[in-house]
Each structure stands twice: as structure tokens, then as C-alpha cells.
Amino acid sequence: MGFTEAVRTVLKQKYATFSGRASRSEYWWFMLFYVLTAFTISFVAGLTGTFSGLQGGISALATVFLVIGGLFIVALILPLISLQVRRFHDRNMSGWWYLALVILSMVPYVGLIASLAVLVTNLLPGTEGPNKFGPDPLRPEARAEVFA
């Protein structure tokens, strides 16, 4: 799965789909899209805010980009969580483990370990063949079932 296909899949086909599995490529391509877009919005908001700060206030343009950034984050909360749950499913793990790790990440020092656990889970390949969460997203027969 390439960049465009991953973004299209997450935003159009599986926006709030918590069932099934997400391959590593789907996950990492979408995360790249998310990080690049968030960085671009933040960078432009920072630039417009920096130049308006010289005049003693925040410009309307900086405010617009801050609002766009906020809306972007709110709009992608659900697909990001569903993508993470489906990535856990690909490892044959319940999505509830993600909730447990998010809660643990709020505890000082434990949060670092919980974040590393999520990172390692996302880096490891999914289980081969079908598992209790669905068919293998990397196998052609699995794709044929999904797009049939």
C-alpha cells in the first residue's frame, strides 16, 4: 500500500472502522501524512504569528491557521484511534490494550515505557494469515474479499 492509497483508505473507507486489521504500510504512510500536514499547518501558523507579534498582537491570518490546526487535530482523532486499534488487531491484540497503554502513559515515567510498547507494536509485522480480527491485509485473497 502506498502513500495515497493509505490516506484514502483511512480517511474515506475506514474513517471510524475499529474492526479488521491495518498493515504496517497503511499505518506508517498515514502517520507520515498526519505529521507532515500538522507540521506544515504549525509552521505556517508560527510564521504568521511571528510576523504579527512584531506589531504587538496576533494577526487574523495567524488565528485562521491556529483554528485550521485545531480542526485538523479534532477531525483526525477518530481515524487515528481506529487506525491504531486496527494495527493492534494486525498483531492479534485486542484494541483495549491501546486504551490501557494510553491510560498508563499518563503516569510519570511509566508513560515512556507505554509509548515504547506502542511503538514496538507498530514496528513489528502483523500475524501471518487470518487471525481472530480478520484476514491478513498483505495477502491478495484478503484484498479480494474486502474489495469484492
How would you label these PLM feature ranges?
Residues 50-60, 130-131, 142-144:
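Short, surface-exposed, charge-dense and proline/glycine-enriched linear segments
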Residues 1-33, 80-97, 120-148:
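Membrane-interface extramembranous regions at the lipid-water interface
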Residues 1-6, 10, 52-55, 59, ...:
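Coil-to-alpha-helix initiation sites in intrinsically disordered, low-complexity, charged segments
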Residues 26-53, 61-84, 94-123:
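Hydrophobic alpha-helical transmembrane segments in multi-pass membrane proteins
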